[in-house]
Amino acid sequence: MNLLVLSRNPQLYSTSRLVLAARSRGHTVTVADPLEFRIVIAKGLPAMFLNDAPIGRTDLVLPRIGASITNYGLAVVRQFDMMGVPVLNNAVAIARSRDKLRAMQLLTKKQIDVPITVCARTPESVELSLKLVGGTPAIVKLQQGTQGIGTMIAETPQAVTSLLEALWAMGQDIVLQEYISEARGADLRAIVVGGRVVAAMRRQARAGEFRSNLHRGGSSQRVDLDKRYAQAAVAAAKVMGLEVAGVDLLEGKSGPKILEINSSPGLEGIERATSVDVAGAIIAHAERLLLRRTRRKNRKDEVIEGERRTTRMRESLIPIPVAGGKRVNLVRGA
């Protein structure tokens, strides 16, 4: 398999682990910065150039699109899809998961539990919004953000109002979310690959910090998810349409609550906490995905060829009228 990994930095742990896992299984791997691609849009001829040269044979694309380049990165991913190249994850799924509000809307439509979330844009709406999420403390989030960036806690109604007004003045779209006190600064991160949880860990925020992200100094330990939590993680990834996902869950009084879904989950923390070869699991799923696609294509080609043979056979018959208005078909050249 010729695998293309879209990543701005080949030295990142997650990128280098995916490259190592793929090469150890005999695959050829190229790492390319999404911003270095040139997209050619033409009727019937979508194309891509990398560093001003046409891209070579690519069997599958594995995107690692950072939040800072979401728009152009998704355009590159969509172009590969238009060219018929399999992508693990596709642009629509990535875009869904990046928009926190959209993700919550889709999850609740499928009856998947999430923290109570409110979106508003006027100062007059703050008081009601705060009541809807259960008062303070409350969580204020930018609609797009990763690794805990853009996630804040407001301890008082005045702090909520000040935060919201400041963010709105900067043109930011935000959501207000209930604070799940029983989680005690901890959450669960489950890595879902191909519809199953391959690894999971519990993350605990450091003292004085409410965000449990490892990039924010949190600690982690391996955990075996019970059935309800594993099912919730798998269902959340499925709703987004993600083949590979990092699903963050809170342990609420009533059970799992989906906090966030990441289309490019970091591998360092989860692999070190669990000793699970997550990168290998992702590459193995890419192999299965490509194999299924190849088999479907072969079956489709067989059907098309069978239809062509049938058409040729029908065209080779000559209708001959006989007495009584009946016809007899004779094979041409017989």
Write out the residue ranges for each language-model feature.
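A long amphipathic alpha-helix within ATP-dependent nucleotide-binding catalytic cores
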Residues: 170-173, 209-258, 280-296, 306, ...
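Short, hinge-like loop/turn segments at secondary-structure boundaries
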Residues: 46-50, 104-108, 133-135, 156-159, ...
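ATP-binding N-terminal substructure of ATP-dependent carboxylate-amine bond-forming enzymes
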Residues: 1-88, 92-93, 332
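Protein kinase-like catalytic core scaffold
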Residues: 138, 198-199, 245, 257-260
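Glycine-rich phosphate/pyrophosphate-binding beta-alpha loops
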Residues: 67, 262-275
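A short linear hydrophobic-aromatic micro-motif
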Residues: 116, 137-140, 174-178, 244-247
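A conserved helix-loop-beta module that forms one wall/lid of the active-site cleft
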Residues: 23, 27-34, 77-149
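Phosphate-binding site of ATP-dependent enzymes
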Residues: 151-240
